[in-house]
């Protein structure tokens, strides 16, 4: 009979999840049936797929499907499938642990507020563990396709932190889950109730879901189950139906099925494509970002079918990585049933599907972003809040759609009082000053640092808008986004300041004159700061601050250097340029000290002031001091 009775403990996170579900999801208990039916559907899909390569797994054929039953006397509900089944090891691995990445992040988000936690758990996808919302004991009996009847397995738990595993004899391939209902859950011991839940959440599943027929027993004065089974769902692939025949409610229910989420999608597109390649696509934009959005190992949200036969779950070849948040189904009429991931990478049909699906997703985003309807614009704002940083990756990954992606970008800006990223590049160009020919931006590690940085002072004085870039991906993105509609993107904190036509001849002449007057100060400052600064120069970008640091042309910014170090990567060893404001009293005092041919005290005072101006500029841009104690000593000497 195989391995003996064995008792094991749940993974720690499972205990916590079970507790949360029992206490947080009581208001939406019926989702347990949706989740268990979805799992059963996946198991049958996997059998179909593995059966292509090994027909013996089908064990003589027979109709594939799901059966639901209940026993009012025993107070049990049963969900059975004849899918791929599980071995003993698979039962322990799949039912005793949470395999999905992002688990730690998930638990860190929980607030203790039942309403918020319920939504969060629904977003995360509770799967098999949802059974414990209504059951105080769950029994799972299973046998994997292709193994002897003697290698069946029984898994059982009361949801109390432990589970048992036994070897059993099981003639049928597949899995049967029996829920022993909690007190007060008799509502689910009703054929009408169970049917209504299936038709609400799982009507679209392309497998027949069956229950026993019922008839009225006059003697017992109640409905009695018959031996005959009846299909209670439509059992047709939703994506294969004409759009006109599918309601919004059905689209939403299908999204919840494939995404394992409780909420509604932000938008969807359903199309049949004919021509060089023939395929059907049903693609959804989620409302919320998953916890593992930034995980390099995370799975794609696309399911691939060939002629309605499930092929694979995470078909990442069908969309570029920057659209990895998209959920949905693609059903090809051209790919072979025995398609492998290697074939997918080389297939011309897959390339056509990828290009077509990318255009559809970008089209969905454009229709929301460009809409005059406030509700649609709000949808795009929601999308950008959750997925904007990922979309920016497309500028470096998808050259063919680079211009379309650039139009979809949104930024914070000095035009707005808050940190909301709502300004498009087209919005910015529409507000440019007469004579302005550049799009100005500043990058910083957060909105406060960007908004209050000294580099913005002359732009604020002249009323010129500056984009505030604070996402970690922005510096990388800018290496691919050099211009938009023939307007160059220019950092206000890089290189010499060139305001072009925003500056008149009189201003330029005055600047040249001042630079000549302060040349002795600049020359001496270069010598003193040779170890810290690449260059020292007089600037006209400052109106209130005495100094600022800028990156030289071709060098990485201080912001990017700090981000690289935080990520554990080596940043190029470059020095910033120190710029001094000739109109500021501190700089004028510094120039006066430079002109005095005094002794050691005057030299020390000059160097202290100069180093303090450099260090203050470094702090103002969000940097950290290499030697804070030295800075404090210099400030103390100046204050004494």
Curated annotation (Swiss-Prot):
Signal peptide: none annotated. GO terms for cellular component: cytoplasm. The keyword Cytoplasm applies. SMART domains: HATPase_c. It comes from the Bacteria. GO terms for molecular function: ATP binding; ATP hydrolysis activity; ATP-dependent protein folding chaperone; unfolded protein binding. Its main location: cytoplasm. InterPro entries: HATPase_C_sf, Heat_shock_protein_90_CS, HSP90_C, Hsp90_fam, Hsp90_N, Ribosomal_Su5_D2-typ_SF. Pfam families: HATPase_c_3, HSP90. Residues 1-341 are annotated as: A. Residues 342-562 are annotated as: B. Gene3D superfamilies: 3.30.230.80, 3.40.50.11260, Heat shock protein 90, C-terminal domain, Histidine kinase-like ATPase, C-terminal domain. Residues 563-640 are annotated as: C. Keywords: ATP-binding, Chaperone, Cytoplasm, Nucleotide-binding, Stress response. It is found in: Cytoplasm. Molecular chaperone. Has ATPase activity. Belongs to the heat shock protein 90 family. This is Chaperone protein HtpG. The gene is htpG.
């Amino acid at each position: 009979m195989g391995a003996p009775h064995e008792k094991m403990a749940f993974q720690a996170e499972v205990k916590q999840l079970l507790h949360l579900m029992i206490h947080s999801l009581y208001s939406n208990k019926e989702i347990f049936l949706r989740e268990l039916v979805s799992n059963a559907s996946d198991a049958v899909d996997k059998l179909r797929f593995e059966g292509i390569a090994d027909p013996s797994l089908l064990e003589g054929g027979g109709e594939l499907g799901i059966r639901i039953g209940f026993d009012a006397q025993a107070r049990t509900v049963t969900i059975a499938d004849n899918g791929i089944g599980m071995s003993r090891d698979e039962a322990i691995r799949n039912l005793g642990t949470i395999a999905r990445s992002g688990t730690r992040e998930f638990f860190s988000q929980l607030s203790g507020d039942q309403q918020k936690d319920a939504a969060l758990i629904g977003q995360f996808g509770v799967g098999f563990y949802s059974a414990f919302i209504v059951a105080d004991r769950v029994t799972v009996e299973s046998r994997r396709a292709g193994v002897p009847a003697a290698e069946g397995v029984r898994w059982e738990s009361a949801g109390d932190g432990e589970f048992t595993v036994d070897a059993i004899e099981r003639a049928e391939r597949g899995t049967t889950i029996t829920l022993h209902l909690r007190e007060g859950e008799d509502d689910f011991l009703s054929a009408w109730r169970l049917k209504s839940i299936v038709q609400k959440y799982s009507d679209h599943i392309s497998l027949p879901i069956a229950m026993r027929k019922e008839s009225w027993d006059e003697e017992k004065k109640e409905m009695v189950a018959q031996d005959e089974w009846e299909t209670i769902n439509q059992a047709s692939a939703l994506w294969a139906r004409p759009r006109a025949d599918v309601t919004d409610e059905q689209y939403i229910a299908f999204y919840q099925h494939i995404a394992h989420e409780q909420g509604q999608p932000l938008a969807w597109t359903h199309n049949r494509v004919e021509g060089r390649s023939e395929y059907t696509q049903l693609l959804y934009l989620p409302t919320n970002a998953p916890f593992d959005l930034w995980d390099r190992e995370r799975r794609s949200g696309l399911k691939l079918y060939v002629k309605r036969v499930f092929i694979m779950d995470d078909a990442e070849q069908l969309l570029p990585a920057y659209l990895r948040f998209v959920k949905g189904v693609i059903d090809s009429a051209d790919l072979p049933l025995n398609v492998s991931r290697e074939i997918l990478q080389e297939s011309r049909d897959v390339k056509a599907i990828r290009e077509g699906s990318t255009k559809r997703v970008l089209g969905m985003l454009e229709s929301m972003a460009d809409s005059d309807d406030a509700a649609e614009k709000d949808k795009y704002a929601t999308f950008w809040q959750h997925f904007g940083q990922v979309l920016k990756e497309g500028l470096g990954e998808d050259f063919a759609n680079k211009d379309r992606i650039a139009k979809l970008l949104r930024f914070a800006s000095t035009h707005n009082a808050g940190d909301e990223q709502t300004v498009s590049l087209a919005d910015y160009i529409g507000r440019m000053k007469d004579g302005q020919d550049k799009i100005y931006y500043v990058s910083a590690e957060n909105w406060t640092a960007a908004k209050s940085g000294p580099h913005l002072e002359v732009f604020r004085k002249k009323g010129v808008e500056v984009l505030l870039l604070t996402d970690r991906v922005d510096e990388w993105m800018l290496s691919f986004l050099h211009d938009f509609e023939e307007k160059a993107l220019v950092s206000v904190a890089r290189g010499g300041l060139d305001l072009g036509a925003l500056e008149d001849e009189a201003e330029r002449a005055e600047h040249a004159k001042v630079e000549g007057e302060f040349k002795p100060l600049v020359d001496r400052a270069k010598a003193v700061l040779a170890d810290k600064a690449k260059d020292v120069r007089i600037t006209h970008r400052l109106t209130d601050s005495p100094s600022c640091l800028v990156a030289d042309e071709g060098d990485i910014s201080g912001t990017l250097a700090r981000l690289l170090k935080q990520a554990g990567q080596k940043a190029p060893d470059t020095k910033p340029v120190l710029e001094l404001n000739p109109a500021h009293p501190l700089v004028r005092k510094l120039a006066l000290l430079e002109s005095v041919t005094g002794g050691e005290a005057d030299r020390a005072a000059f160097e202290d002031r100069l180093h303090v101006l450099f260090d203050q500029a470094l702090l103002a841009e969000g940097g950290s001091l290499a030697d804070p104690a030295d800075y404090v000593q210099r400030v103390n000497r100046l204050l004494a």
